[in-house]
Regions:
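Non-transmembrane "mature" sequence context
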Residues: 1-167
């Protein structure tokens, strides 16, 4: 585990250095690379915080929607209460997301990681994220991640299921 922390720090530094030297309208923020989801998952919490603060590459929205959740981009934007026209423009221009936008995407990544650990299958985790849940007043887990209390509740549900705690 200790070996992954320096590697994760180097990945964040590379992304930051690359962004500093990347021409305007072109971003190399976290989310554009093939292994970025795994890199982010393995980062230490403060490195994750730094990556969120610097802003993910806007293309991460498309990648999370299509590759991880198997839903249309518009569905994810709506679920996270992100403005479609702004985000689609950022994707087209290869811009970075703001800190707040990146934070909402990171919540999806954090929850998907917990759900994948629980179900031991990323497809089952994605299906769980997209199904109505009685403990969320009939809402889908992905639909409540736009605000902190919703995120906290989804994490609580997954942690209770993982560790066998009864409500």
């Amino acid at each position: 585990m200790a070996a992954t922390k320096p590697a994760a720090r180097r990945a964040v530094k590379r992304a930051a250095a690359s962004a500093a030297t990347t021409p305007a309208g072109s971003s190399n923020g976290l989310g554009a690379g093939r292994d970025d989801f795994d890199t982010f998952r393995r980062m230490a919490p403060m490195s994750q915080r730094r990556a969120i603060a610097e802003g993910f590459d806007a293309v991460i929205i498309e990648r999370v929607a299509r590759e991880l959740l198997g839903v249309p981009v518009q569905s994810l934007l709506s679920a996270l209460s992100l403005p479609s026209s702004t985000i689609l423009r950022k994707i087209a221009k290869h811009d970075r997301l703001s800190q707040g936008e990146s934070d909402r995407v990171a919540r999806v990544l954090f929850v998907l990681n917990l759900a994948t650990d629980l179900f031991e299958d990323s497809e089952r985790a994605a299906m769980w994220m997209s199904r109505a849940n009685a403990e969320l007043d009939g809402l889908k887990p992905v639909d409540v991640l736009d605000v902190q209390p919703g995120y906290d509740r989804v994490r609580d549900i997954l942690n209770r299921a993982q560790f066998g705690v009864v409500a």
